Each structure stands twice: as C-alpha cells, then as structure tokens.
Amino acid sequence: MADFFTTPGGIAVLILAQVLAVIGFVMVSLLFLVYGDRKIWAAVQMRRGPNVVGTFGLLQTVADALKYVVKEVVVPAGADKTVFMLAPMTSFVLALLAWAVIPFNDGWVLSDINVAILFVFAISSLEVYGVIMGGWASNSKYPFLGSLRSAAQMISYEVSLGLIIIGVIISTGSMNFGGIVAAQDGPYGFFSWYWLPHFPMVFLFFISCLAETNRPPFDLPEAESELVAGYQVEYSSTPFLLFMAGEYIAIFLMCALTSLLFFGGWLSPIPGLPDGVFWMIAKMAFFFFLFAMVKAITPRYRYDQLMRLGWKVFLPFSLVWVVFVAFAAKFEWFWGAYARWGMGG
C-alpha cells in the first residue's frame, strides 16, 4: 500500500485528499462563522440570536443553507443569464482558491510556494470581477451602482494592504508564509511577533481588511438604505448563497493573513508551550470575533469618507512606513527588529 502512494496515481490521490481536507475545513468553519457572527451581533443588541434549530441553535446555519438551496433560482428579465450565474461561482471559487497557500502549521500547506503572498494578493484582486459581473449582468441600475462602489472600494484598499505587506516582506526577506512565521519565532513568545515592531500597521491592516471584504463600517456596496442591497439585490437561492459563502470565506482568509503576518501564525504566545495548529485556529477565531464586534458596534461611513480615508490617510501613512522599515532594516535600527532575513528568508 505504501508503494502505491509513490506512483503518479497515488500522488494524485494524496493531493486530492489534501485539497478536500482544506475545503472541508473551510466549509465546516463557515457554518460556525455565520453562527458566531449572528450570536455576537445578538449579544451586543441584548437578543438571544439563533437558539431553536439544534443544540444552542448550532444547526441554524445548515437550515438556512438548505432553505436557499431548495428555493427557485430567479433570473431577472433582460439579464445575461450566463454571466449572471457565473458571477457568484467566480466569487466562491476564487475565495476558496486563495487557501491553497495558507499554512495551518509547519509544513501543513497545500502549495508551499515562495511567492505565496503575491498569489493571495492576486486572487484577492481578481475577486472584484465576480462583483462587477453580478452587478452588470443583473440588468438593473441598483446592482450596477453597488458593483461599481464595491470595485472602487476594493481596489482602493488593496493599495494600502499591499504597502503594509511590503513592510513585512522587507523585514523578513521572504514572501513565503512559512518564512514569515519562522522570522517571528523568538525567545520572548508573544513579544517576538511582528505586531510589536509593525504596531501602527496592524490597525491599518485590520481596517483595510474590513474595507476589502465589504464589512461594516465599510459595507457601502450593500447599503440597504441607499442601494437596495447592492449588487446582490437580484440574486436568490443558491447564487445568493454562493455570494454570501464567498464573502465569509474571504473574511476568514483575512483573519488567517493577520495571524500569519503579525501574530506568529501557529507559534505559541508563551515560551515553553508547544507550537501547533491549535494556536493558528485560535488566533483566526479571535480576529473573526473582532470582525463581528466591529460589525455590531460601528455605524456605516459615507462613501466620500471611505474614499478619503483610503487615499488621503492610509495610502500616505503606509507609504511612509515602507520607507521607514526599509531604512530600519538596512541599518538594523531598534536592535535588528526590522531585519530578520537570516531567520525567515
């Protein structure tokens, strides 16, 4: 049996099993993410939230998903049916594809490529096409306006996200997530991670992630009071479910990126405790909790405020930070905290 897995067919079976394992983890996590999001929102508003279907309401997300699947798929009159159906599938598949390079532990990754950050950034940039396709193919002005806003918002904040990530790359000398985590492995545990030397950028990165994933307070494309639910207004049944699933998977991906880039990934926060996948999942869950809390307690920004924040505040600040990190790494300021090439490169 062991010899079989050394053959091309056996290797293909192993790769397929690994792919299915990652997809299974993401999809099962998705059920709990939606449930947790609704529970946190309910707790802030002093409500109970989902509590009927299953124990503590844990099966509510499954029931909602089944409800969407069994409903009729309604295509608006005059819509481009092919593009209309292709848009949610594009968003969903691209959201899943980015997980191919996300490690959960040392060596636990589908594709351990040296340009993993560029891969994730490229996939994230492509996700705007699903939104544009959905808004344009609906043959309605409300989805189209929502898709245009979403495209402008996502492209604007990708610039600041990229510059913040460049600062981490300069410090590490690597675009591989394993190398970045290895560079944060120090004797001081939690205080060896990049959140400390890159402290201002952690906040900018988190806020940019909110804007990139269209989460409150930056949910301009889905502003019900202005755009009638934005680019999703004409969608129902399974296509709408795919859009929602893709959005939550992208949010979970941003939680994973925050953990890997600034908070040590699978590294233990306490020296002496073993590292492992538990820490990675715990950090991702914590950052999703922050996403949910921000959604529950913050009002929505106006569109002009959102654009001004991205172009006039985040972009100049992150650009200056890249220059600062470059000099700090070159001349090894602050005891070499910005120059860890030998550790992670």
From Swiss-Prot:
Chain segments annotated as transmembrane: 13-33, 84-104, 115-135, 161-181, 190-210, 248-268, 277-297, 309-329
Name listed for the protein in its UniProt record: NADH-quinone oxidoreductase subunit H
A cellular component term, taken from the record's GO annotations: plasma membrane
Keywords linked to the UniProt accession: Cell inner membrane, Cell membrane, Membrane, NAD, Quinone, Translocase, Transmembrane, Transmembrane helix, Ubiquinone
Reactions it catalyzes: a quinone + NADH + 5 H(+)(in) = a quinol + NAD(+) + 4 H(+)(out)
Chief location: membrane
Domain of life: Bacteria
NAD listed as a keyword: yes
PANTHER family: NADH DEHYDROGENASE SUBUNIT 1, NADH-UBIQUINONE OXIDOREDUCTASE CHAIN 1
Single GO molecular function: quinone binding
GO biological process, one term: aerobic respiration
InterPro entries: NADH_UbQ_OxRdtase_su1/FPO, NADH_UbQ_OxRdtase_su1_CS
Described purpose of this protein according to its UniProt entry: NDH-1 shuttles electrons from NADH, via FMN and iron-sulfur (Fe-S) centers, to quinones in the respiratory chain. The immediate electron acceptor for the enzyme in this species is believed to be ubiquinone. Couples the redox reaction to proton translocation (for every two electrons transferred, four hydrogen ions are translocated across the cytoplasmic membrane), and thus conserves the redox energy in a proton gradient. This subunit may bind ubiquinone.
Membrane topology of the entry: Multi-pass membrane protein
